[in-house]
């Protein structure tokens, strides 16, 4: 596990969304508070939710961003405005995708347990999140004395902490890999210090409940 690196997290996601009941959590994507969701969505054709829907048109999206949800609904997407930590959608799914959302939440454990309640037994939860030890962050700390942190982030996860939290919440880990979307500026570091300096990582977990 975590012995391979992909360029695009969608390489991991796509096999788990074909011909399945899929929920995409955080479908609007994060945004700076000063930027309107509707404007940003209109200029972001490659957003994860759209890529998922292109593979599985029956996908349901959920997000707490009311403006963004309204914008997606106006485009014809099946979306719901709800808090992923406390939502009760009244239905279950085969796959839940949580792409770059867990680091925005006040209570990651509450979210994982609630995700489990929305999965059928043996269902799949896919979580991707930025890597706190990304080589670019190391450079920024060295150069500027601090890392670059999104204004809406509340926590950091690494593969060890996230897999431990998933297990505590009743999941078993099925797969994990690193995400490095562009060529590294620190090729020597990467060779010597392994992929732990990659940009992000993805964990695929199975719900063990009924």
Name every feature range the model reports, one short phrase each.
Residues 24:
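Class I SAM-dependent methyltransferase core
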Residues 32-54:
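SAM cofactor-binding core of SAM-dependent methyltransferases
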Residues 98-101:
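A short beta-strand submotif of the Rossmann-like class I SAM-dependent methyltransferase core
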